[in-house]
From Swiss-Prot:
Pfam families according to UniProt: Late_protein_L2 (PF00513)
Quaternary structure (record): Interacts with major capsid protein L1. Interacts with E2; this interaction inhibits E2 transcriptional activity but not the DNA replication function E2. Interacts with host GADD45GIP1. Interacts with host HSPA8; this interaction is required for L2 nuclear translocation. Interacts with host importins KPNB2 and KPNB3. Forms a complex with importin alpha2-beta1 heterodimers via interaction with the importin alpha2 adapter. Interacts with host DYNLT1; this interaction is essential for virus intracellular transport during entry.
Modifications the protein undergoes after translation, according to the UniProt entry: Highly phosphorylated.
Segments carrying motif Nuclear localization signal: 1-12, 443-451
Keyword Coiled coil: no
Keywords, sorted A to Z: Capsid protein, Cytoplasmic inwards viral transport, Disulfide bond, DNA-binding, Host endosome, Host Golgi apparatus, Host nucleus, Host-virus interaction, Late protein, Microtubular inwards viral transport, Phosphoprotein, Viral penetration into host nucleus, Virion, Virus entry into host cell
Protein name, per record: Minor capsid protein L2
């Protein structure tokens, strides 16, 4: 015997149960909290709303109206006010009968309205009467109506702004007025005033500066920072880098390219020098001094990677080659004498008292000086007597000549013929009757204490 289980019947809704069981007090325990909003979830929302403003979101235990502001439908828009314009007057519709004509005729009583001034009509056979007047006669227009003809009068006058006068004269004296548009006529008989010119240049001593004050220091132009972290430092030992830098990048022999300009290359995988791999550009050279050397530098650009858009990405390289050191040399160069060395017997003393006793000495008190001649081959000295110039009684100043020294000389003519006798020594003699000293020289401070002699009525013979 099979037992049949009774089918489960669905319970009524919470709202229907609450309406019937609330009054009798027989409601299930889960009905009243759901309807009255006293469940645990509703209490959590009530407690949290004390510190959190939920606004008009409609979250709570209310009646489900969306709070004070109500619900706003998603994607909706606010109400707009439509302006209604003035209404047109109704058009009277006239019915057309079957017997009425289909062609509407125009109104025959309507007149054409013409606008504009009427075209003047001239009546008469004599034509226009033209009257002329001078520059002083005012223009008079004949406005008297005439039934026979129309008279037109014209006035001729001379405008000096558009006509050149026959004789240009000096304008009259200018006047001072508050109006800036005050001018003087350019023709006619006018008076003029002669205004003398004034010299505005001030006199000076001639020592005024004629140029501006120069800068105290020389402003140095900032050069490229070759030794920064942005450049890779590569030393090139190949001397071809100075004259033919393209030979380090390409194998072919291109046409002549100047070495002092920027060189451009195509990226290659096989290059003669591995330091110049992926180089596409070499900038112009520069000479710098670095740590006591003269350095030849060039900046290069590598093209290591290419993006899809064609952008080249690569490092910047500083290639340099040290040419020569500029440090001072530790060696000392000994200077060589320009005059050949002589023996001891060829030397002489210019202050030696060696005079010829055969020559008479004048009785006047003078200072004696010896004169010698130097010769590298013949060790001999020739003395001359004192030369006394007749002087006045102002100061007793002797006049003498200095020694004549002949330096050794060589000749390229072969054979060399040595002189048999010393050449005649030329001396300087001063002849005169008197002389004078400029007294002002005694009071002017001088660096070297010497008195210049000025001889009058004399000459110098060599």
């Amino acid at each position: 015997m099979v037992s049949h289980r009774a089918a489960r019947r669905k319970r009524a809704s919470v709202t229907d149960l609450y309406k019937t069981c609330k009054q009798s007090g027989t409601c299930p325990p889960d009905v009243v909290p759901k309807v009255e909003g006293t469940t645990l979830a509703d209490k959590i929302l009530q407690w949290s709303s004390l510190g959190i403003f939920l606004g008009g979101l409609g979250i709570g235990t209310g009646s489900g109206t969306g709070g004070r502001t109500g619900y706003i439908p998603l994607g909706g828009r606010s109400n707009t006010v439509v302006d209604v314009g003035p209404t047109r007057p109704p058009v009277v519709i006239e019915p057309v009968g079957p017997t009425d004509p289909s062609i509407v005729t125009l109104i025959e009583d309507s007149s054409v309205v013409t606008s504009g001034a009427p075209r003047p009509t001239f009546t008469g056979t004599s034509g226009f009467d033209i009257t002329s007047a001078g520059t002083t006669t005012p223009a008079v227009l004949d406005i008297t109506p005439s039934s026979t003809s129309v008279s037109i009068s014209t006035t001729n006058f001379t405008n000096p702004a558009f006509s050149d006068p026959s004789i240009i004269e000096v304008p009259q004296t200018g006047e001072v007025a508050g109006n800036v548009f005050v001018g003087t006529p350019t023709s006619g008989t006018h008076g003029y005033e002669e205004i003398p010119l004034q010299t505005f240049a001030s006199s000076g001593t001639g020592e005024e500066p004629i140029s501006s004050t120069p800068l105290p220091t020389v402003r140095r132009v900032a050069g490229p920072r070759l030794y920064s972290r942005a450049y890779q430092q590569v030393s090139v030992a190949n001397p071809e880098f100075l004259t033919r830098p393209s030979s380090l990048i390409t194998y072919d022999n291109p046409a002549f390219e100047p070495v002092d300009t920027t060189l451009t290359f195509d990226p290659r995988s096989d290059v003669p020098d591995s330091d110049f791999m992926d180089i596409i550009r070499l900038h112009r050279p520069a000479l710098t001094s670095r740590r006591g050397t003269v350095r030849f530098s060039r900046l290069g650009q590598r093209a290591t990677m290419f993006t899809r858009s064609g952008t080249q990405i690569g490092a910047r390289v500083h290639f340099y080659h040290d040419i020569s050191p500029i440090a001072p040399s530790p060696e000392y160069i000994e200077l060589q004498p320009l005059v050949s060395a002589t023996e001891d017997n060829d030397l002489f003393d210019i202050y030696a008292d060696d005079m010829d006793p055969a020559v008479p000495v004048p009785s006047r008190s003078t200072t004696s000086f010896a004169f010698f001649k130097y010769s590298p081959t013949i060790s001999s000295a020739s003395s001359y007597s004192n030369v006394t110039v007749p002087l006045t009684s102002s100061w007793d100043v002797p006049v003498y000549t200095g020694p004549d020294i002949t330096l050794p000389s060589t000749t390229s003519v072969w054979p060399i013929v040595s002189p048999t006798a010393p050449a005649s020594t030329q001396y300087i003699g001063i002849h005169g009757t008197h002389y004078y000293l400029w007294p002002l020289y005694y009071f002017i401070p001088k660096k070297r204490k010497r008195v210049p002699y000025f001889f009058a009525d004399g000459f110098v013979a060599a």
